[in-house]
Amino acid sequence: MQVRVDKGTVPLSTLRWGICSILGLNVQTTPEGSPMEAYKSEFIKFMVESDVLKFGSFTLKSGRQSPFFMNAGAYVTGSQLKRLGEYYAQAIHDNFGDDFDVLFGPAYKGIPLAVVTAIAYHELYGKEVKYCCDRKEAKDHGADKGNLLGYEPQDGDRVVMVEDVTTSGKSIDETY
């Protein structure tokens, strides 16, 4: 299957571990012509239009080579962040329904992702969702001491991690 974007046609298999893992999806390539949920295709187009998704030859943080690169830090407007949160909320709802309690965004780019996704999830599905994020450095003063920002997960909480890109899982390992 091919995914058409403004800057050319890219095989979905190329995007499988990048774009689709951004949404936290277990996506398998489908035969040519099979329907893709509209929001997934729209999300890829949105990333290209927002100049967030680049095509070329890139060395990722993990050391892997990739024919594309996604920089979530390039979402710079309120309307872009609103749409981004909606795409993430749709993907989470498709994969988990309402069977989660907390959205966790690892520092640093995951922080705004958790916030905009929590807002969008409430707007789209009516569920009040808590969010939390970690700090790379523990805070030792004020009311919010420690490594967490926002809600502090409790035993039994079901947590969904939202992140811009996952290639090796290193940031998941770095998060406690």
Identify the role of each PLM range:
Residues M1-V5, T9-Y176:
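PRPP-associated nucleotide enzymes
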